[in-house]
Design a protein with these regions (language model features):
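N-terminal, polar/charged subdomain of small-to-medium soluble alpha/beta proteins
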Residues: 1-103
Length: 103
């Protein structure tokens, strides 16, 4: 099975600029991963969403790169998943584009 979580949007502290360390900004997260499904073994995607949001808000990452590395490790340790693809975007940091990083 493959789970897709698209356009997970919320505000958190992320970035290295002075104003980014004070004011929360919108981030958008997209991810997908595979896992071995059976009737008694499944992944609750609402728990995955909550874990991502709580982690991003708690850790207050300076770099998107650090957030991706941290979340990748956390998700792989928490769940039996394969082929995790993770993308984090900061849609409001620049006026004329959306900045994103992915693994």
């Amino acid at each position: 099975m493959k789970i897709h979580i698209n356009d997970l949007s919320f505000k958190c502290i992320i970035g290295i600029l002075d104003f980014e360390r004070i004011k929360k900004q919108k981030v958008v997260i997209n991810l997908s991963f595979e896992y071995d499904f059976s009737n008694d073994k499944f992944i609750d995607y609402s728990e995955v969403v909550d874990l991502i949001k709580q982690t991003m808000k708690k850790e207050k990452f300076q770099l998107i790169e650090d957030a991706i590395l941290y979340l990748t490790k956390l998700l792989n340790q928490t769940y039996e998943i394969k082929n995790l693809k993770l993308k984090i975007s900061k849609p409001t940091i620049l006026k004329d584009c959306i900045v994103s990083l992915s693994n």
